[in-house]
Amino acid sequence: MYKRQGTIQLLREICSRDAAVRVLPTGTLTKGHEGKALAPLGTMKKAGVVAVTDTTSGVQNNEIMRRALEYAAMFDLVVLDHCQDSSMTEGGQMHEGAWSLRLGLRGLPRAAEEVVVSSDCLLAELTKARIHLQHLSSGGSAEIVRRAKAKQLSVTAEVSALHLLLTDAA
């Protein structure tokens, strides 16, 4: 039995009874959200998890992500990915552009997101897995997702309200 199975079942019971919205449990994609070794996806699926994610850290290794997508597809789990190449964003404080330069703040280049969106879409095509790309912020990422959807890949994406309202152009 998965050691968190009781917690997942309790959460599902409480939410089905008390929540005003439908709540679906997610599990970790890699052990400890470290991006190094896959978590026990099969046992989490049996416990009631419907999707897996490494939350805001994202998986930084493409081989681990490929294996994770293959494994998740075996159990019909959706992989939720935070698309950001941390090697390009370390110390970043805001969108890279005129305002970051003017304020003297290290910027987060849109390429840091788009390179992960691209690789995730390629890996989703290779593995036939379902993937959801979280809180995208660039038009380039949206275009990559459009192309993936045109190929009938199981790729979905979303943008956060913060990315729509708090831009450097506002």
Short names for language-model regions:
Residues 1-5:
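Conserved small/polar residues in nucleotide/adenosyl-binding loops
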Residues 13-28:
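A glycine-rich helix N-cap at a beta->alpha junction
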Residues 36-170:
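Histidine/acidic residue-rich metal-binding segments in metalloenzymes
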